[in-house]
């Protein structure tokens, strides 16, 4: 069997076939990365049968270069592509947080006013604000309100001493308020209805999307009713005239009234009809003119 000539430590050569030891570069692509295989012959090895091969596998990134970690200090704030999205914490709306000195009081009697409620709570500290919620139209008490003390300790003392106490037949419920101020009133029951709107209003197609009254329809309907309304003579509205028209009372004297078409205006000019009975055995009654005068007179 032919043997290869020995190679010195400084000599290296390439073998085009992968079966023979040599230096070849094979590239294999996968879905994740690219592997480059480099095969080199060991210069110090003279064994022709074994042909020891040293393989160095270098794993590279898909882009061919390792990623460089980005530090927050290395970010350019003027560059929008590299600037980090920093969200500042949003502060709560002013007046919405309760520090502990604002109280919510319910069970307030309808006859109790703000000054009286302040006098009750001022025994335990300085009351800086008091408000009883009321109806917007009638101004009647809704039975609850809010108070504020100058310190949290004073508010806590008021809760411990006034909670479940009875005033004017109602029991107070005193506790820390969830908010330092009440919610803004909403349209409707607590803010008051729009008195200009009534049942005849309907939505219109105007730009503001509000409600308006159809003045044209009301004006035309009133004009139609007035044009076809019959005119009646004015009459006196007195109790006597009303009775005459209501019951059709004849104001003439009774003797001048007609009865079935016959007038009895002067009864002395009319003779009473004879009431005769033609039945045999009965004599006719004498008429008014046949009665003889009394001779004794």
Swiss-Prot record:
Residues 287-297 have a biased composition (Polar residues). Its main location: nucleus. Signal peptide: none annotated. It is found in: Nucleus. PANTHER family: RNA-BINDING (RRM/RBD/RNP MOTIFS) FAMILY PROTEIN, RNA-BINDING PROTEIN SQUID. GO terms for molecular function: RNA binding. Residues 101-179 form the RRM domain. Pfam families: RRM_1 (PF00076). This is Uncharacterized RNA-binding protein C25G10.01. GO terms for cellular component: nucleus. GO terms for biological process: mRNA cis splicing, via spliceosome. Residues 209-223, 233-253 have a biased composition (Basic and acidic residues). PROSITE patterns: RRM. Residues 254-263 have a biased composition (Basic residues). The keyword Phosphoprotein applies.
């Amino acid at each position: 069997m032919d043997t290869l000539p020995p190679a010195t430590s400084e000599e290296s050569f390439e073998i085009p076939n992968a079966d023979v030891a040599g230096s070849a570069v094979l590239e294999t692509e996968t879905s994740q990365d690219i592997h480059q295989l480099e095969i080199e012959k060991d210069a110090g090895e003279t064994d022709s049968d074994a042909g020891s091969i040293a393989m160095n596998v270098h794993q590279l990134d898909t882009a061919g270069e390792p990623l460089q970690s980005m530090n927050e200090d290395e970010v350019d704030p003027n560059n929008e592509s590299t600037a980090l999205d920093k969200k500042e914490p949003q502060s709560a709306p002013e007046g919405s947080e309760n520090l502990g000195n604002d109280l919510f009081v319910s069970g307030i009697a309808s006859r109790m006013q703000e000054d009286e409620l302040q006098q009750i709570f001022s025994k335990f500290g300085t009351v800086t604000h008091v408000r009883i919620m009321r109806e917007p139209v009638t101004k009647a008490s809704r039975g609850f309100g809010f108070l504020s003390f100058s310190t949290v300790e004073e508010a806590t003392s008021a809760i411990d001493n006034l909670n479940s106490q009875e005033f004017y037949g109602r029991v107070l419920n005193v506790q820390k308020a969830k908010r330092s101020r009440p919610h803004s009133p909403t349209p409707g029951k607590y803010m008051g209805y729009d008195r200009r709107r009534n049942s005849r209003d309907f939505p219109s197609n105007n730009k503001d999307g509000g409600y308006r009254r159809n003045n044209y329809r009301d004006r035309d309907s009133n004009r139609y009713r007035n044009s076809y309304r019959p005119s009646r003579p004015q009459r006196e509205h007195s109790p006597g005239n009303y009775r005459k028209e209501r019951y059709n009372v004849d104001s003439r004297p009774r003797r001048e009234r007609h009865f079935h078409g016959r007038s009895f205006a002067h009864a002395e000019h009319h003779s009473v009809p004879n009431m005769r009975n033609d039945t045999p055995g009965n004599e006719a009654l004498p008429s008014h003119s046949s009665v003889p005068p009394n001779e004794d007179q």
